[in-house]
């Protein structure tokens, strides 16, 4: 199940600015020491999982895959004690989680995935689930041990639900999702300190309410649990859970999704889901996300996080800040090219097409030919027409698996282009 060599290729920087030379030498030594520590497997599973998720923001996967593989092999051969099973379960789940982050980096959708990532993701999710069930059959477990087992059982079922949904197995996805919700609740009831459960519950409850359709009707009685879901994820961030890197990304996306949700159009300004309030929170979260993870010293082989810039680009574009939006989209494109060329990552071509469409959209919205500039107006109308054709033909500015979200975004951008077209009398 080794996938790391297929995903990441280490490459030293060709040149360094003289001003930073001394500090880079020190950092290089510290990084080497850290990698050696990882290889020796000195980190407990929960600590390793937390550090690995943070490193995933910088596309640093390889040392963690190696560590997880080594620890899983060692623990599989060890006596089947409760403590060993807890560690093994956590490493299985952490491995699946890192593969999930690889799939996000490559921009997997139901139409684009690599078996070299998707199959191990399913495998390690199943192994985490199996190990959790073995644990729960043990006699004499403490409430804390039971809570941990239910936490990872629910988390693994959530992963399996996501995988099965992508494979088109809706029934299995619904069943595993329902089980995940119940088991995460059990984890919190047994031990409220299992704060990671908040992230899983938030994803499940918001996601089912916002995107679920039939599954929301079956699993949640059709109830609108969007706000409850958002609050769970807020709690995961407030309590500084290990899942905070994922919680930030998810919560920002969900807040963007609420701004374009037509169900919110007639809400009172005092309603927590009022679009302007969701916009304000999205901007706050983007600033916090940047300050917490992307404002430190320059990192080797890292030029930026494409998810952060993609969210920033969309928010700026929704706000009508098209110059900023274009700049952020261009940064996403730069990062995609870097990941493809320098790290040999197979980025979904549709993501790149969507980003290019975003850049074109911003360019069009920035056009401002004078009333007497007939050539400029004709040129603008031609470009606007091409972009309208792109959107009408199924093109997307965001490669998102939810048809509902794609449709809502298309409507917003299509409407803006139509208004610009009318302004120029195209």
Residue ranges of model-derived segments:
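Bacterial N-terminal signal peptides
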Residues: 15-23
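Residue-level recognition of tetratricopeptide repeat
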Residues: 81, 146, 194, 242-244, ...
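Alpha-helical junction/boundary sensor with strong preference for TPR arrays
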Residues: 75, 99, 132, 139, ...
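Short coil/linker segments at helix-helix boundaries
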Residues: 36-40, 44, 48-70, 88-193, ...
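Terminal, low-structured helical/coil segments at or just beyond the last alpha-helical repeat
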Residues: 350, 357, 361-426
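Generic helix N-cap/helix-start motif at coil->alpha-helix transitions
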Residues: 41-44, 209, 242-247, 301-311, ...
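Boundary at the C-terminal end of the N-terminal hydrophobic targeting segment
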Residues: 28-32
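N-terminal secretory signal peptides that target proteins for export/translocation
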Residues: 1-9
